[in-house]
Amino acid sequence: MSERNVIQELEARGLIAQQTDSGALQKLLESESVTLYCGFDPTADSLHLGHLVPLLMLRRFQEAGHRPIALVGGATGMIGDPSFKAAERKLNTPDVIAGWVDKIRRQLSPFLSFEGDNAAVMANNYDWFGQMNVLEFLRDIGKHFSVNAMIKKESVQQRISREDQGISFTEFSYSLLQGNDFAELNCRFGCKLQIGGSDQWGNITAGIDLTRRLNQQQVFGLTVPLITNSDGTKFGKSEGNAVWLDPQKCSPYKFYQFWLGVADADVYRFLRYFTFLSIEQIDAIEAADKTSGTRPQAQRILAEEATRLVHGDEALKAAQRITESLFSNDLSALTAEDLAQLALDGLPVLDMAGQGDGLIDALAASGLAKSKSEARTFIQSGAVSINGIKAEGLDYCLTGNDRLFGRYTLLKRGKKLYALLVWPA
């Protein structure tokens, strides 16, 4: 992607929801290397899939010759963005937030290049807000914001209209903080463009207005669309839980499986959003899937590309190895690290501490059988295997020989149902 066509490329991918003064922004991007930023508040100890599109946008702009700033909200994270949130956020302690800031900085770093003429910048807004007192804030920033305009914003109106919730002055002031981030980054780094999710539009335009007032600079905003599944449900949830980017919170195997499960109606759109494959390559994949008469390849390609982007080549190979091993019932290739991934979140797990060693008991306790009677029936019908070997004998007791790497026993019932027994170390 060249810097002369970055906006057209993003539009072709469906990645632009809103932008300010599109003609002037396009002209600016074609005429110089532009510094842009996106903010990431530490609301948890990890980023999740909802952060991935704007994060990849920073990388897309950098590959087009522009300079990205990844701003971690050490200050704004202490307040909490109320935009389209139904209730007040819980306030976390400064120590907790500082720890989360460090983790998120480490997560952001691999996506960007910190070398070359357009080397990325990592910033923390606590650096300028931490020493600012309340009088400075009210005099230098607050006087430029109209309460009349602020309460008309849709995100604020939604909260004000709810008698059971309302909005605190703390959260109401959030847009002032984010607005000042833009002005500060413009002053420090010459930043001229802010990107974010479509729910950030009000905060972004507030920052544009403040930067114009404080710095007499024209700056721009661009948002990415809210990502939803084709059925209208929120994207980025697995069984109701967020899909985290931290491999200790969501294993690479679970991450890979999430993408394999993407619906046919969504997969080509997500290839445009979440990969760096060209539009032509994605169109070719879609055309081939429609004419092949076999299972579509798009989900596999999406899973490979997204897992490689977030977790790297080795983690992708491990996710593929685990997937193939479970599918083939041949566990010989699995490593201790692979089984640890499955123990984290890949399979139903039964902690064997305090459990008996009878196979029937393990089947019932793990949920592979509803009762001991049903467990007996499954064993008698040859539907149960232990570490890939068919179980025989109703009175079978698990021994040390059934423990992979001294810790794990993989039970299987039927063709697809697994449970992982984890023995005390």
From Swiss-Prot:
It comes from Laribacter hongkongensis (strain HLHK9). It comes from the Bacteria. It is found in: Cytoplasm. InterPro entries: aa-tRNA-synth_I_CS (IPR001412), aa-tRNA-synth_Ic (IPR002305), Rossmann-like_a/b/a_fold (IPR014729), S4_RNA-bd (IPR002942), S4_RNA-bd_sf (IPR036986), SYY-like_C (IPR054608), Tyr-tRNA-ligase (IPR002307), Tyr-tRNA-ligase_bac-type (IPR024088). A motif ('HIGH' region) lies at residues 42-51. The gene is tyrS. NCBIfam families: tyrS. SMART domains: S4. This is Tyrosine--tRNA ligase. Its EC number is 6.1.1.1.
